[in-house]
Curated annotation (Swiss-Prot):
Subcellular location(s) per record: Secreted
Entry GO MF terms: lysophospholipase activity; phospholipase A2 activity
The protein's name: Lysophospholipase
Gene Ontology CC terms, in alphabetical order: cytosol; endoplasmic reticulum; extracellular region; plasma membrane
Record-stated family: Belongs to the lysophospholipase family.
Keywords for this protein: Glycoprotein, Hydrolase, Lipid degradation, Lipid metabolism, Secreted, Signal
UniProt-listed InterPro entries: Acyl_Trfase/lysoPLipase, LysoPLipase_cat_dom
Origin: domain of life: Eukaryota
């Protein structure tokens, strides 16, 4: 069944049955459902869930075959490829792969799409000129903010391919049709825009009328969904995150395990720092490995009022709260950054006053971010000793964009020792520099986190400072970190090897603004094409041995644990691609401009609203994902604000 047939079938099932794993209300509004009277929805984060563990057994069947094929092809010119056979002689010695897709708005979604396409054997030319089959060999696929839009789009559209999306780009209701701004989706067709926002308003107001707290992220997530699920009724208004459990391609383990990342915001605060609790959403659960929570809950029953995991009303749960768009919006919600900086922007005064007024009202109720209420972790007993209990004591759970702690690549869920990942491909489409290219800042932040209180139970390989990243060219092309496990023994455990793939110019200036909210068909294709080239060293033209080097990185952890002989070609690869510990901290101008720097956000917002960006633009603003003006708490007045803002976009 192809993508279009599946989408039509899914919509038909939705209207015919209504329930299944979709929202039981057939709408955006959560609803009460029956559940076991003795059910407990929370567990300690002592390892993967039973559901994930059982799923991994199915996935391993597919990755084993795909990885063997990839490694055989990649090492076909090696003088000695016996290591591949040695690894596959025992199931426990087969490497486990993860891919992490960074944030960065549509830039990250499109460039990241090209990078994933380079790893996907369903992409035209990926086997001949790329890393085709690597994605089929991958167990975990994590996304954050714009990277989560990419992961969520592929996973929740029946594991479609980037190639299929590209092939259908000119069709009606095509995925990622962002020719018009998300704020003005109808373009010159004003009626279309008004109708869209009327539907969004109705959906969110329905949730509010049912007694659930709503926030700007509800609106943002609903608006985004029309771009990701255009063939589903009203952008999948009743499509839930847990629906994926019942989709055959996931049930059978034919696709990677998708993970979305968001940050927790402590009650009564606005600033997000490196000690923020990192949350993950997967098809079975949401929660955190961090000691400040150390727990997971069943994502299907979010919205249920609980005490330490037990429903307050025995035998009664809530379902439909885990709307797919809401969770994808949560990972890209940046409204609190504007709350900090809106007054310093150069917006026209009447719009600034309008926006600031709404933001002030929202701030008082802390509705400027994603709010999960009732708190699914209320009274949880799994928080580790000597850590704040503020999350469990609050009636609400507050979540924000997963990169606001400066970890713009979702690495934390993938480096957990219990998941046994051997290598992580870190796709970095951040806008860290003045010219909106990455500079390794995300890797630096995750490395530093392991030495903070939140990093009590994690490890990450050594990486250099940002200046060294730039001075040594580590942010211009793929680089490997943690190549020698013998140098990592002083960490909590041996972490995965990290293959860092940064956004870089090959055939197109892909350093576009995160606030660029519309792309023409041509721009989309060029962004995707450039991403493919960034992941493949220019279609393997810059280095014809790169695929073999990727194979070496994949095998490295298991090769060292077995004390097996390293092919001489791998030694050459590691000399060329592994960071060898050299530091060059010569001052570099234009760094420290993170996607999530609130000061940069204000100037970025101003620039976006006063400049016109063309397809050849090599500049842009530096703020991630959900950089939209605040929306009024009175949903009936939403169009007033949107119409005013649309005139400046």
């Amino acid at each position: 069944m192809n993508l279009k047939e599946w989408l039509l079938f899914s919509d038909a099932v939705f209207f015919a049955q209504g329930t299944l794993a979709w929202s039981p209300s057939n709408s955006y509004t959560p609803a009460n459902v029956s559940c076991d009277e003795d059910i407990n929805l929370i567990r300690q984060a002592s390892g993967p869930s039973d559901n994930e563990t059982e799923w991994l057994k199915k996935r391993d069947v597919y990755t084993r075959e795909a990885l063997r094929s990839f490694l055989d092809r990649a090492t076909s010119n090696f003088s000695d490829s016996s290591l591949v056979s040695q690894l596959f002689s025992n199931a426990s010695d087969i490497p486990r792969i993860a891919v992490a897709c960074s944030g960065g708005g549509y830039r990250a979604m499109l460039s990241g799409a090209g990078m994933l396409a380079a790893m996907d054997n369903r992409t035209d030319g990926a086997n001949e000129h790329g890393l085709g089959g690597l994605l089929q060999s991958t167990t975990y696929l994590a996304g954050l903010s714009g990277g989560n839009w990419l992961v969520g789009t592929l996973a929740w559209n029946n594991w479609t391919s980037v190639q299929d999306i590209v092939n259908n780009m000119t069709e009606d209701d095509s995925i990622w049709d962002i020719s018009n701004s998300i704020i003005n989706p109808g373009g010159f067709m004003i009626v279309t825009t008004i109708k869209r926002w009327d539907h969004i308003s109705d959906a969110v107001e329905g949730k509010q009328d049912a007694g659930f707290n709503v926030s700007l992220t509800d609106i943002w997530g609903r608006a985004l969904s029309y771009n990701f699920f255009p063939s589903l009724y009203r952008g999948g208004v009743a499509y839930t995150w847990s629906t994926l459990r019942d989709v055959e391609v996931f049930q059978n383990g034919e696709m990677p395990f998708p993970i979305s990342v968001a940050d927790g915001r402590y009650p009564g605060t606005q600033i997000i720092d490196l000690n923020a609790t990192v949350f993950e959403f997967n098809p079975f659960e949401m929660g955190s490995w961090d000691p400040t929570l150390n727990a997971f809950t069943d994502v299907k029953y979010l919205g249920t009022k609980v005490s330490n995991g037990e429903p307050v009303n025995k035998g009664q749960c809530v379902a439909g709260y885990d709307n797919t768009g809401f969770i994808m919006g949560t990972s890209s919600s940046l409204f609190n950054q504007f709350l900090l900086q809106i007054n310093s922007t150069s917006l026209p005064s009447f719009i600034k006053n309008l926006v600031t007024g709404f933001l002030d009202d929202l701030s008082e109720d802390e509705d400027d971010i994603a709010i999960y209420a009732p708190n699914p972790f209320k009274d949880t007993s799994y928080i580790q000793d000597n850590f704040s209990k503020s999350i469990s004591e609050s009636d609400y759970l507050y979540l924000v964009d997963g990169g606001e702690d400066n970890q713009n690549i979702p690495l934390v869920p993938l480096v957990q020792d219990e998941r046994n990942v051997d290598v992580i491909f870190a796709l970095d489409n951040s806008a860290d520099t003045d010219y909106y290219w990455p500079d390794g800042a995300s890797l630096v932040s995750t490395y530093e986190r392991q030495f903070s209180s939140q990093g009590l139970n994690m490890s990450f390989p050594y990486v250099p400072d940002k200046r060294t990243f730039v001075n040594l060219g580590l942010a211009d092309k793929p680089s490997f970190f943690g190549c020698d496990a013998q140098n990592l023994t002083d960490l909590n455990y041996i972490p995965p090897l990290v293959v860092y793939i940064p956004n870089a110019r090959h055939s197109y200036n892909s350093n576009t603004s995160t606030f660029k909210l519309s792309y023409t068909d041509d721009e989309r294709l060029k962004m995707i094409k450039n991403g493919f080239e960034a992941a493949t060293r220019g279609n393997l033209t810059d280095d014809s041995s790169f695929m073999g080097c990727v194979a070496c990185a994949v095998m490295r952890r298991k090769q060292q644990s077995l004390n097996a002989t390293l092919p001489e070609e791998c030694s050459t690869c590691f000399t060329n691609y592994c960071w060898n510990g050299t530091i060059d901290d010569t001052p570099v101008s234009g760094l420290d401009n993170s996607d999530f720097d609130p000061t940069a956000a204000s100037s970025a917002y101003s620039a976006y609203n006063t400049e016109s960006y063309s397809s050849s633009s090599a500049t842009g603003s530096k703020k991630n994902g959900a950089g939209l003006p605040a929306t009024p708490t009175s949903f009936t007045s939403i169009l007033t604000l949107l119409t005013a803002i649309a005139g400046f976009l």
